[in-house]
């Protein structure tokens, strides 16, 4: 499959107009929507423009990995793909794709786990380059391992999120990696000639200080390390109240969920995250430490019933994609306030400069500081 294509080949064509119309209709929901954040960027458009000829010649089916809100999947359909197999780690991204597909009347795609998205017939993959190198390695290995022997990967992102090391990672799974010129502050990498590789395994680290083993699938936040926000919550875990049902919200690798389960073995502990690799990692971490945890992929606490938790622990993200934004954390505070029982507690760690206390008091209830460093603050909020 050739991936060579220039802007001039497509400018003013009916397909170009149809693609522009599609992209203009896309929204981010249920992701954060603001005037500054939109559902596609120049990297998506560059990737689609470049891949147009390859899509038309790919035999009908294309694989898309890492689509953020549906631009690549729905764009590939506009450009002639008869079916798109999609893998994305984020449940928010999946829901945004489904919402945009319903809005635009497109349905010829299917959602898959990473180890199921490729087929031996897959010849073309459109990949939104992740910033995490271990995640990129896992994705590249899966494509090279499970795709057609002549599979081509066209990968892209904005320049500010790219490094030369990404080229090196791709070269570990593909013999040829070509680098495009920059366009609108975006760049593409095209990988061909897959090597004989195996799937990347999870990583594992023992943290003796807290007597915990961390197991992490590629791409989970902080990997198999103890991030300093989680450490701050562990350091005050002896002050957590008693609980019959507790939730690690935004669980990442599940260290806090494991601590909750070890501290009160009879409790029902839920580890919840929007990320598929986080949920898988939390389950593996719990198993490695001999405890039982219910690992759930969810947007916030949307599947949890009102007033059912005694304790929620939270180390919230402060980015929406690459942009610093408080919107995700504030949504999680609201969810926690809804799911906590009267008298239940939310223990939160946050970057001190973000000053979340007013938002916590609005969403949950009276909030007091438990500990503070120049970088992190731990608070406890009590549901009235």
Q: How would you describe each model-predicted region?
A:
Residues 40-109, 228-314:
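Conserved SAM/SAH cofactor-binding pocket of Class I
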Residues 2-4, 9-66, 72:
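Extended, compositionally biased accessory segments flanking or bridging domains
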Residues 124-133, 249-256, 309-323, 336:
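Conserved proline-anchored active-site loop of SAM-dependent methyltransferases
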Residues 147-148, 340-342:
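Helix-to-beta-strand junctions that scaffold the AdoMet/dcAdoMet cofactor pocket
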Residues 127-209:
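N-terminal auxiliary segments of SAM/dcSAM-dependent transferases
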Residues 143, 260, 332, 336, ...:
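Class I S-adenosylmethionine-dependent transferase superfamily signal
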Residues 174-209, 220, 351-384:
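Class I S-adenosyl-L-methionine
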Residues 32, 37-41, 46-54, 182-245:
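SAM-dependent Rossmann-like transferase core, predominantly class I methyltransferases
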């Amino acid at each position: 499959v050739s991936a060579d294509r220039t802007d001039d080949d497509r400018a003013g064509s009916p397909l170009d107009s149809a693609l522009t119309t599609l992209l203009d209709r896309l929204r981010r929901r249920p992701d954060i929507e603001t005037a500054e954040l939109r559902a596609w960027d120049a990297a998506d458009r560059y990737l689609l423009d470049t891949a147009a000829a390859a899509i038309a010649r790919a035999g009908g089916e294309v694989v898309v990995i890492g689509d953020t809100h549906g631009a690549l999947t729905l764009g590939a359909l506009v450009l002639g793909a008869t079916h798109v197999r999609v893998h994305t780690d984020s449940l928010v991204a999946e829901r945004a794709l489904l919402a945009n597909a319903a809005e635009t009347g497109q349905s010829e795609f299917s959602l898959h786990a990473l180890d199921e998205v490729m087929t031996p017939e897959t010849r073309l993959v459109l990949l939104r380059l992740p910033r995490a190198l271990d995640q990129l390695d896992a994705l590249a290995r899966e494509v090279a391992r499970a795709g057609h022997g002549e599979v081509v990967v066209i990968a892209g992102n904005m320049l500010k999120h790219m490094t030369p090391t990404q080229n090196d990672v791709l070269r570990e799974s593909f013999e040829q990696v070509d680098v495009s010129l920059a366009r609108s502050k975006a760049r593409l990498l095209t990988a061909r000639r897959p090597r004989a590789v195996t799937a990347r395994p999870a990583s594992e680290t023992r943290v003796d200080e807290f007597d915990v083993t961390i197991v992490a699938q590629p791409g989970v936040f902080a990997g198999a390390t103890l991030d300093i926000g989680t450490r701050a919550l562990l350091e005050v875990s002896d002050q957590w109240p008693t609980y019959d049902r507790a939730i690690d919200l935004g669980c990442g690798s599940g260290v806090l969920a494991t601590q909750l389960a070890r501290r009160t073995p009879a409790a029902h502990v839920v580890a919840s995250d929007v990320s598929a690799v986080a949920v898988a990692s939390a389950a593996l971490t719990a198993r490695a430490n001999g405890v039982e945890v219910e690992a759930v992929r969810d947007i916030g606490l949307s599947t949890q019933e009102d007033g059912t938790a005694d304790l929620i622990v939270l180390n919230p993200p402060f980015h929406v994609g690459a942009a610093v934004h408080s919107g995700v954390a504030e949504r999680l505070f609201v969810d926690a306030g809804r799911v906590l029982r009267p008298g239940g507690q939310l223990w939160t760690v946050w970057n001190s400069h973000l000053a979340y206390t007013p938002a916590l008091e609005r969403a949950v209830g009276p909030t007091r500081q438990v500990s503070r460093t120049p970088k992190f603050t731990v608070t406890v909020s009590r549901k009235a």
